[in-house]
C-alpha cells in the first residue's frame, strides 16, 4: 500500500493494549505507526471504561519526542459498560471534563 494513502486519515475506533484481550498494538506503538503513515487522529477504545488518560499520555509523549513535526492527535473515549456503572451521566460528565471525545453506549454489558 502506498504510504500517502493514509495521510490525514482519522480512525474512530481502535482497541489497543492494555486490554483484557490481547490487541495488536499498545497505545504508543499505535501512535508511532500512525505518525509514520501521516494519520491525523485516532480514537482509542476499551470495553472496560475510559481511555482519555491514555490518550493524554500519548499526546504528551508525541509532543516531547517529536516536537511539532506532525499534527497527529490521539483521542480518548468512555464506554458505558457495567465497569463505569452502565448508562451513568456522572461518569460521562467526568470523562468529558477529563478530555474524552467519544461516548460509546454499552457493548459487552448491553442486553441486545
What kind of region is each of these model predictions?
Residues 69-71, 81-112:
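Extended substrate/RNA-proximal surfaces in nucleic-acid metabolism proteins
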Residues 15-17, 47-49, 77-83, 106-110:
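Active-site beta-loop-alpha junctions enriched in small/polar residues
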Amino acid at each position: 500500500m502506498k504510504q500517502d494513502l493514509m495521510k490525514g486519515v482519522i480512525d474512530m475506533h481502535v482497541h489497543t493494549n492494555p486490554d483484557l484481550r490481547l490487541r495488536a498494538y499498545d497505545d504508543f506503538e499505535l501512535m508511532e505507526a500512525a505518525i509514520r503513515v501521516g494519520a491525523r487522529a485516532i480514537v482509542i477504545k476499551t470495553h472496560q471504561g475510559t481511555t482519555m488518560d491514555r490518550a493524554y499520555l500519548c499526546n504528551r509523549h508525541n509532543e516531547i519526542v517529536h516536537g511539532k513535526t506532525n499534527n497527529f492527535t490521539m483521542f480518548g473515549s468512555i464506554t458505558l459498560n457495567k465497569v463505569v456503572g452502565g448508562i451513568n451521566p456522572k461518569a460521562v460528565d467526568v470523562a468529558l471534563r477529563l478530555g474524552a471525545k467519544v461516548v460509546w453506549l454499552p457493548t459487552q454489558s448491553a442486553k441486545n
